[in-house]
A protein has these predicted regions:
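Active-site metal-binding motif and surrounding structural segment of the metallo-beta-lactamase
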Residues: 38-84
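Conserved beta-strand hairpin/beta-sheet module of binuclear metal-dependent hydrolase folds
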Residues: 4-48, 131-147, 165
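Cap/insert and terminal regions of metallo-dependent hydrolase folds
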Residues: 154-249
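Active-site neighborhood of phospho(di)ester-bond hydrolases with catalytic His/Asp-centered motifs
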Residues: 31-35, 55-63, 83-86, 144-147, ...
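Metallo-beta-lactamase
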Residues: 86-140
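Active-site environment of divalent metal-dependent phosphoester hydrolases
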Residues: 17, 64-68, 89-91, 129, ...
Length: 250
């Protein structure tokens, strides 16, 4: 993982098969999503020296399995509060994904205290109710995590502005998607305004944010079938280079 400042954004795993990240400041941290099994997630936390007792809660972006697959077993073994939009919490509760004893807390737009952190949710354009998170850390930094969005709407633009770090979806390369094995309906879903953000769309937004003063970025939720890390990075470098911006690879 990468250390950006005292507060850290750490991707535990990311991609089509599962997504989870950590926002950490000192000994306290938040988990955002848990899309792989409890063994994978627990091993990733242990490798970072993170004890569950130091976690202030789990933030859930939406109900898709690549974001919640590991929650059920993890929460049977560990007692942590879960935060999210009302529709997502209702889904988790009604489908038995979270234990009946689990504390569920709605986050609906205004900033709320989640342990040592200030957390504000904002809606993203996806094919189920979905949110991103703007997080204020105890050391005064601001991070925004925005994945699973087909288009950059005004609430997303607002949430991405003025951050110390932005973790933004760079899901697919358009050529790989259109020339790949996916059936038409699935390609259309991914490309739609309720699907996912392409490398080109992500890169254009990163250029805007750099021009506004943001300096730290993480590319997230890369498709294993329709993208590669090298291609996502090269798209960013090409976009920035065309604008005369020289990026640093961290």
């Amino acid at each position: 993982y990468q250390r950006f400042f005292m507060a850290e954004f750490i991707s535990l795993y990311s991609g089509s098969s599962g997504n989870s990240s950590v926002v950490r400041c000192g000994q306290r941290y938040l988990i955002v999503d848990m899309g792989k099994g409890v063994r994978t997630t627990s091993a990733a936390l242990k490798a970072l020296g993170l004890a569950v007792s130091d976690c202030d809660g789990i933030l859930v972006t939406h109900e898709h399995s690549d974001h919640v697959k590991g929650l059920s077993t993890f929460l049977k073994k560990n007692t942590l509060p879960v935060y999210g939009a009302a529709a997502t919490l209702d889904f988790l509760d009604s489908n038995g994904i979270v234990p009946a004893s689990c504390e569920l807390h709605e986050l609906e737009g205004r900033e709320e205290d989640v342990g040592a952190f200030g957390v504000q949710s904002f809606p993203t354009s996806h094919d189920v109710p979905c949110v991103g998170y703007r997080i204020h850390t105890p050391d005064g930094k601001t991070m925004t995590i925005a994945t699973d969005l087909g288009v950059l709407t005004p609430p997303v633009h607002e949430a991405l502005s003025g951050c110390d770090l932005v973790a933004l979806e760079s899901n697919y390369d358009l050529h790989m998607l259109r020339s790949g094995p996916y059936p038409y309906y699935l390609r259309a879903r991914i490309e739609s305004t309720r699907g996912h953000l392409s490398n080109d769309e992500c890169s254009a937004k990163l250029l805007e944010l750099i021009q506004e003063g943001c300096k730290k970025f993480a590319l997230c939720h890369l498709s294993q079938e329709n993208n590669t890390p090298a291609l996502a990075l090269q798209t960013v470098f090409n976009t920035l280079g065309a604008a005369g911006v020289v990026p640093e690879k961290d």
